[in-house]
Amino acid sequence: MAWIQIRINANADNADLISDLLVEAGSASVTFIDAKDTPIYEPKIGTVQFWADTTVIGLFDANHDMDSVVALLNADKSVAQNLTYKIEQLEDKDWEREWMDNFHPIQFGKRLWICPSWRDIPDPDAVNVLLDPGLAFGTGTHATTALCLKWLESQDLTGKTVVDFGCGSGILGIAAIKLGAERMIGIDIDPQALEASLDNANRNGVADKLEVYLPENQPEFSADIVVANILAQPLRELHSVILGLLKPGGKIAMSGILTEQAQSVADVYAPFIELDDIAIEGDWTRVSGTKKA
C-alpha cells in the first residue's frame, strides 16, 4: 500500500495540538521525533514530554487530499503562525515485511538464543526462545533487554519462581522458563503486554508455567528471582513494591537505567540488597544484587 506523509516543524507547546489536528484530518498514524538530537531521558510517570524542537509526522493514504490537511492546520491561528511543513510520497513497500527481514536471531551468553518466530533456529541444541513481539516492547535488540537476558543466562534458575515486573512481550519470563524456572509470573500495566506474553509463551510451549497479571490483580507470593526492565524513576518510586515480591536471599536485576541514573537507583536499593557491580552496555546499565535476610 502506498502512503503519503506530512512532516511538520513543532515545539513542546504545540506538538500535541498538531497531532490532534492531523488525527482529525484523517491521519492513519502520528509520530513524534526529536528534530535536534535533544534527548528526553525520562518524563514523569503519566506525562508525555516533547522536545523543544519536535517533528510531527502524519501518515495518510496516498490518495488523501493533503490540501485539506494543510487548510485544517492553517485554520488554527496558534499553529498557522509558524507553520512549516513538507509533504512526501513514500515508496510502496511492505513495511512489516521489511522490519521482519531485519530482525535476526541473537545469542546471549553461551546457551540462550532469541529467535524471531519466522526465522530458522541457528542452534537446535541451544536454549531457544521463539519471539513474535506483536504490540508489546521487547525483542532482545535493545541494550536494556540484553543486559537482563545475559544476567538470567548466568543464573541457576532450576526450579525457581521468577517475576518479570513490566513483562512486555514476555521475552525475559519465557527465557527464564527455558533456562529452568519452574514458575514465571509476569506483571504489567498494559493488557496488550499480557496478551503478547501469553501468545509468545504458547509459541514456546511454556504457557503452563506462565501466569500474567495486572498489578491490581496479582496474588501474594514470594519469588526467588525478580527482573524489572522498566525505567529508573519507577524503579526508585516502586522499590518497596518490587522488593516485596522477593524473598530474603533472592536475587534481583533491574535495567532501563541510563548510566548517569545507575547510582541513584543503587542508593535506593542498597539498604535492602547486597549490590553486585553495576553492568554497563552503551548508555545503559543493570543494577543487580541479593536481598538481605
Swiss-Prot record:
Annotated compartments: Cytoplasm
Keywords: Cytoplasm, Methyltransferase, S-adenosyl-L-methionine, Transferase
Keyword Cytoplasm carried by entry: yes
A single Gene Ontology CC term: cytosol
Superkingdom of the organism of origin: Bacteria
SUPFAM superfamilies for the chain: S-adenosyl-L-methionine-dependent methyltransferases (SSF53335)
Protein name per UniProt: Ribosomal protein L11 methyltransferase
Organism, as annotated: Pseudoalteromonas translucida (strain TAC 125)
